[in-house]
Amino acid sequence: MIRAYVKLKLQTGLRRTDLLGLTKSHVTPDCLTVTLSKTQKKTGKVLEFEMTPELREVIVECNAILPLSPYLFKTRKGESYLKEDKTANGFTSIWQRWQNKMPEDKQFAERSIRNYVGHQGDEQGASEILGDSIETTRKHYRSNVTKVKPLSSSSRATKP
């Protein structure tokens, strides 16, 4: 289940609350439709991810995980990991157990996947897939890059 989650997050860059809230009704033959929970009440922004072979493959993988449920990512009882208050303690525990099985130098935070997606491609493309403005993408996902011009021999200060 975690591997399917990571694959889908790498393709979509969706936040944890949006991924864990996905149901089969969000999936059509043409696209995966997601109303972003962060801006749902403000703007109601909707992202439609084109149904590529890779996206279809990971959705089929999610649907194959038992038990049968309307949720793509579900508990052993078929319920959503996402609670009404938008917490996902059960999922967090599973994530931590999965990470603890990895060598320490290979472990990573769940939210770092969204950061990774935000660094891929050009700013416009990253902004579109994340559902953010270019300014937000620049601020949150590309802010650790500062363009610096190196000193040239003619611009170095001389010793006093």
Regions found by a protein language model. Give the residues of each.
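Basic, Lys/Arg- and aromatic-enriched nucleic-acid-binding interface segment
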Residues: 1-16, 20
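Short, basic (Lys/Arg/His-rich) helix/loop patches that form interaction surfaces
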Residues: 2-3, 12, 49, 66-68, ...
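Catalytic core segments in nucleotide and nucleic-acid processing enzymes
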Residues: 24
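C-terminal catalytic core of Y-nucleophile DNA break-rejoin enzymes
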Residues: 40-61, 69-97
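Beta-strand residues in well-ordered beta-sheet regions across diverse protein folds
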Residues: 33-35
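Phosphate-coordinating loops and pocket residues in cytosolic domains that bind phosphorylated ligands
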Residues: 21, 29, 139-143
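Conserved catalytic core of the tyrosine transesterase superfamily
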Residues: 1-7, 27, 31, 40-41, ...
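DNA/chromatin major-groove-contacting recognition/catalytic segments
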Residues: 47-50, 61, 128-129, 138-160
